[in-house]
Amino acid sequence: MLNDSAGMAVMSENPSPTLSSDEIPLADIYSFLSENDDVEAFRRWVELSSPADTSRLEPCRWLAQQVAFIDELISEQIDAVLHNKRFQALEASWRGLWFLIDAVVNPENTKIRLLDVSWKDLARDMERAPDFDQSGLFHLIYNEEFGTPGGEPFSVLLGDYYVAHRPYEDHRIDDVFTLQGISRAAAAAFCPFVCSAAPQLFGLDDFDNLGLHINVDEIFRSHDYVRWRSMREHDDSRFLALTLPQVLMREPYQDNRRSRRGLRFNESVAGKDNRKYLWGNACFALGTVLIREFSEVGWFSHIRGVPRDHYGGGLVTQFPTPAYRTDSSRATVKMSTSVTVTDQLERELSDYGMIALCHCFQTQYAVFNNCPSLQIPKVYAKKSATANARISSMLQQILCGSRVAQYIKVIVRDKVGSYTTAESCERFLQNWLDQYTTGRDDLSWEMMARYPLREARVVVDEDPAQPGYYSSLVHLKTHYSVDHLVSELRLTTSLSQIDIGKV
């Protein structure tokens, strides 16, 4: 009816006043809403919203006007619900989980488990535990899986949380202490933990100002970050990773006008900032990259950068990028990230252990160019040793080394009682590692997936104080290089004929 051009012309020439919601008495509105009889409710609505003179209005046009007025009122209420801060956080979490599930190509080798626990409960778990190995998180990821025969070790933990260096308004939790406990549990289970940095970590109220020129080096060198730097210097912080900024989880709802039935709802996202858009945790974007890489090659090294003519590496392709409404061809799209991260800012954030999601200019994609862990790489006298320490602290190296360590633990656990000496155990593990090792440098991606190691050696020693207990030292060199440098990863774990209690 509203599409009738003749009718619209008549209405524009003879506009009729209608009562807004502010002009209707509140008692009459409650009476209308509480009425159970549809006919009586319609009669009351007509009485409340009818103009003073309806003789010049045709019934169909008047009804169309009332339907549009009702749509406007309902749209305002839906906007209020959708843009509520708590509702946005809930919707973003579920949509982030959906993106992870949608990224799974082969359900047989990729499993996703959901643990519904708040950051407050996780912090309380770490505070009440006498030590990290007595916490509930350690029991879930280590005792029930990694440390139990038949259990399936976790490869990575994605936490939909935002952390900072100290408590702030509406967040009275010591994140540093909680992260320290999580890092120790994650290191024991060889399972990195990934969450996001809160804007308060940079002294900001939101990520909108992150795109402005800020001195990252000056921020993290201040006295307020002493505990934060101390946590990053610990070896177990290699199993922590922080992503930023936020990523768009859903395009604004828009009426496609293909049907005249139902509500004509267009979500209103206009404002002085972008808070009405649905932003979510960037750890979900990194999770889709990890799932895609593991589904393709069963390995985690190609999770950064953009390879030529290939949807792989650190390229993020699943998340929405709404087009500008003035562009009917959708050739020009908005960013999928909440703020632009420049090359210089990305390098500065990477130096301080942050994994930045960068929008690819004039495309519908984003990319992780670097994947550092939170650890501060150690500095040695030799430049080669310092470079090796920097590369070994990167998340892709930790993920690859952790995968090998988990396999070694499971293999030895299944061979309990079959080894008479440490040498026989060492020989068995070395033969197993040699199956995935080759010294060739001219390998294709497919061959590197089959032989991911350039060099591997293992040393197994028996603990003289504890018969039946073995400790292993594994040295790994992968084929995947970073900035033309090849790193060596060193893993230490204890092997027991009874159980593994320390890493």
Language-model-derived ranges and their functions:
Residues 2-120, 127:
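N-terminal-proximal low-complexity accessory segments that begin disordered
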Residues 45, 73, 77, 93-100, ...:
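Generic, well-ordered alpha-helical scaffold segments in large soluble proteins
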Residues 90-94, 108-119, 441-463:
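Long, charged, glycine-rich C-terminal linkers/tails
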Residues 92-165:
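Long, charge-patterned amphipathic interaction tracts in eukaryotic proteins
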Residues 146-334:
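Extended, regular secondary-structure scaffolds
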Residues 263-428, 437, 480, 484-489:
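Long, contiguous, structured domain-core segments that constitute the functional module of a protein
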Residues 424-449:
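Short, hydrophobic/π-rich interface segment
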Residues 457-503:
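C-terminal edge-of-domain segments
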